[in-house]
Amino acid sequence: KADLLVANNVLAHVPEIVDFATGCGSLLSQDGVATFEFPHLVDLIASAQFDTIYHEHFSYLSLLATEAVLKSAGMHVFDAERIPTHGGSLRAFAQRTDAGSRLEEPGLHEIRRLEESLGVASSDFYSGFQNRADRISHDLSRFLLDAECNGEMVVAYGAAAKGNTLLNFAGVRQDLVQWVADRNPAKVGMFLPGSRIPIVDESEVR
C-alpha cells in the first residue's frame, strides 16, 4: 500500500471520477495521503479561462465538488491550497475516511468559505462567463487584424490544446497567424486542428 499517492492534473481527465477516486483510496495505506491537483473552478470562471474547456476534460472542479466526490469514494479532504499553476489550480490532500488521524487545516476552511461566499453551487456564479469569453475573443481578433493592417507578421509559440482552443474560438486562421512553432518533433509538419495553421520547428523563431 502507498503512503503517498500523487495525482496532478488527472481528475479532470477521468470520465468515471468516483470510480477512479475509489481506486486511489484502495491503494493507500491506513495513514496514507493522496494529493489531487486540478484547475480551480473559481479561477476558471473568474478569469474566463475558456481555453481550459476542451474534449480531454470531463470535469471542472471546485473544492466543494471534490470533497463530495472523494467522500463518495471513502476519502476525506483534510487540507487544500490554491496554487498558480495553469492560471489558478487547487491542490487537495485527502486520507481514507477510516483513518481519521488528521485534523482539517485552516487552509481548507478558508477555501471552503471562499467558494460558499461566491456561490459556486448556484447558477448566478456562472452568469457573464460567455460575455467575458466573447470579449477576449473580440480583443484577440482586433489585435490580429490591426497587426495585419499594419503589415506586421504574427506567429505563435507552442501548439498546445489551450492555444488551439483560443484560436478556434476566435476564428483565427493562417491569414492572421502565419505559423506556430513547437519543439515536439511529432507535431512539426502538422497543422493545428480547425485553424489549419502549420506547425514548424521552434528553430524558426530564432
PLM segments and residue spans:
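A conserved beta-strand element that flanks and buttresses the S-adenosyl-L-methionine
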Residues: 3-6
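Short catalytic micro-motifs in class I SAM-dependent methyltransferases
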Residues: 8-10
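A short glycine-rich, Lys/Arg-flanked "PGG" loop and its adjoining helix->strand segment in the class I
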Residues: 18-33
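Short, glycine-/aromatic-enriched active-site segment of Class I SAM-dependent methyltransferases
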Residues: 36-59, 63-66, 70
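Conserved S-adenosyl-L-methionine
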Residues: 75-86
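Flexible, glycine-/basic-rich loop-and-beta segments that form/coincide
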Residues: 86-132
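A short, well-structured juxtamembrane/interface segment
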Residues: 132-150
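A solvent-exposed beta-alpha-beta segment
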Residues: 145-206
